[in-house]
Structure formats: structure tokens, C-alpha cells
């Protein structure tokens, strides 16, 4: 989505920037094959989570993808998880990434830590979780707006705290088909698929030596 971006200059070398040539090559690769690449690729390269106390206690995140089919109805989600808060599994509620202790031996609870800030507090504001859902259902622009709104429930299920003044979250919805589906079913399914994509972003992310500045990802610490 060309109208949205994440702030990732605090991770790795801030002088490394994407170019028009990189964008052109990314489009060519996207159309050339069907392999899905997730984790630290594309917009997920510098994504991190758990940044209530800045980058030193954060963890690596990335780009996540998920898709499901219900008969002939298809729904896919893609998300870059670059959140202030902690990340939780949509299946069992277990924390899978987030704010680390100062010695990085365990997790801190971002919500509990946030409750310490009784007076106005400058937070690490470089946070944006950007997601999109794409379906083959036949929906109007107004209906897609509603589906995008329902998809946001996935953020609340998987990210806590979420929608803070330090977050700049966005969700987009697009229709590329003509399958007739109830909008309530579609929006509910979109939230489920987005939650899976958020989890996928965490599980497939890993640190890259050339970009090392902050914390390991869950994949590197297992």
C-alpha cells in the first residue's frame, strides 16, 4: 500500500533506504511466482515490537501472511507488525513477542508497565502495524470499509496495548472477485485470518547479522 509506511530507522543502518529499482524488482518477483516469503523481508525488514522502553528492550518482528478458503470464498491477509505493545497467540493467548526485561532474560508486561505512567509520558512513537485483507468476494467500497473495521479486531486480540497515541495502525481491504458472501461472515473471517498473519509475522522473523541493533526474534531464542 503506497500510502502507508512503517518507521524502522531505529533498527539497523538508517542510511539504507529502499529505491525505485527495488520496488520494480519486488513487483516483478511478485508476479513471477507463487512462493510466499515472510519474516524479515520487504516492509518487515526493520519491524520490531515491545518498544515501550525503546529499542533496547524490544524484539524483532516482520511481515506475515495467512489465507483461508470457505468453499469458493477466499480471504487472505498480509501484515507488517511494528507495534508498541506485546504480541499474543490468537490460539491460546500466550505471549510470543514483546517487551523484554533490561537483562533480556524474560518478558515484562507492557500493559502493567504502562500503568506506571500516571503523568504524561513521551513514548517511543515509531510504531505502525499495517495490514491488508484481500478477498474474491463481491463487495462495495462501503462494505470493504466495514470489513476493514471488523478486521481491526485481530489487532486487539493479538497486540496489547494497541491503538495508543504512539501507534499509527492501518488496515486496508480489497475485493478482486465476484463471489456473493454475507458481509458479517466476511468481516469475521477477515479478523481470524489477520490474527493468523500477525502470528506468522512473529514466528517467521529472525535477526539478520548485518542489521543487528536490537533484540533477537523468538525464532532465534528458541
Locations of regions flagged by a protein language model:
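Short glycine-rich or small-residue beta-strand-to-loop segments that form or flank ligand, phosphate
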Residues: 1-9, 129-140, 171-175
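Hydrophobic alpha-helical bundle architecture
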Residues: 131-166, 180-187
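Helix-rich interaction surfaces within compact, conserved domain-sized segments
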Residues: 186-194, 199-201
